[in-house]
Amino acid sequence: MATMISNLPRDLMEEILSRVPLKSMRAVRLTCKNWHTLSITISESLAKMYISKTTRESREGESTIITLMNYKLCLTSLVVDVDPYIEHKGKLTCFNLEHQVKISQVFYYEDDTITTRLVVWNPYWGQTRQIKTRYSHHAFSGRDSTYMFNYSLGYENKNSCRSHKLLRFIDYHWNYRGLHQFFWYEIYDFDSDLWTTLDVTPHWFIVISQSGVSLKGNTYWCARKRSGGYSDHIICFDFTRERFGPLLPLPFSFIDRHHSCVILSCVSEEKLAVLFQYKDHYYKNVVEIWITAKLEAEMVSWSKFLRINTGPIIHTSFFINEEKKVAIGFNDNRKTINIIGEAGYFRELDLGEHAEPYRRRHVFSYVPSSVQIKETAPGNIKKHQSSIETRLFDRNMLRLVAFEKKVSE
């Protein structure tokens, strides 16, 4: 009597799944309900074994990257060699969302991505979790105004398990003299399914034109003192303590540096990297990249990774390949990525698609992980906000309405 593939023993199905290439996992999940369920509930140890096996079998110098262009996320293989090249693996699709969405902002966190619709998505497992915000708000677009929601995903360790949280904040200021400003920091807990207002009075400005960088469960941003000056610091949000740390200095000076730009990245989920780009006295582009030698809650030290004179411009985001000692990031022509390295090494690779003007572009190295997104259990009784939190929320909403009225006058 023939055995249907959906009725195979679990251990045999797990063995089969462990041999499926990552790019074919989505097709396997769509085969039948049993395969889809098993691919999601499969043990973390097996998932770790599979990911480790895939990593070992990668070609030398190969990196898997995700790019955000024209509201789409695409998975690409980049091989850095004497003659580097790219292989397009396809568009990343949230096939378990009711409708496909345009992606305008991405925060990368150890294999999870989050968009401004507040969908947390793990491409490896094919899991998503939609998070309901407490209010909907559109940006005020006025003279000398700067505004954007900022999001970051992190965790604290509870009983050897990761308890995930989502930070969302507004730091809304009208003109840089600080005459009118509004800020509101709140955090969402995946376990309780509740939002909580945080007691934060920032003495800094976070560079909101860039996404934060996740490292070991916490998030880092480029920042500057609220009193003014350059964006010559980083700041960390600790998801365990639910608070910001002190401003930590970057390893370079902005004095006599024209048209400067600072971009933050991470290295192998172990260190931070920062790219400093500026024009020298001869108006030639200079790129410096530094990596953290030591990073603690209240101190940081840096080591220089790379310096390139008259190098090409890198926009928005970047990542590095430590082994090959190169940096990879978007060109300003909106359709190619630059690879820069020592001794004037430079290669330009065409992505095959031109990015639309004024749309966000993002590139980052992608490493699958066994972390799964905790779902809200069906039939759970919804917890209610405390009366104190309700009053804080109502007060902040009144402050926001009053602030926007003042700015629009």
From Swiss-Prot:
Q: Could you list this entry's UniProt keywords, alphabetically sorted.
A: Kelch repeat, Repeat
| F-box domain boundaries | 2-49
Q: Which cysteines are joined by disulfide bonds?
A: none
Question: Sorted alphabetically, which InterPro entries does this protein's record hold?
Answer: A_thaliana_F-box, F-box-assoc_dom_typ1, F-box-assoc_interact_dom, F-box-like_dom_sf, F-box_dom, Gal_Oxase/kelch_b-propeller
Q: Where are the Kelch repeats?
A: 169-218, 221-266
PANTHER family given for it? F-BOX ASSOCIATED UBIQUITINATION EFFECTOR FAMILY PROTEIN (PTHR47993:SF37), OS09G0372900 PROTEIN-RELATED (PTHR47993)
- Any idea what this protein is called? F-box/kelch-repeat protein At1g48625
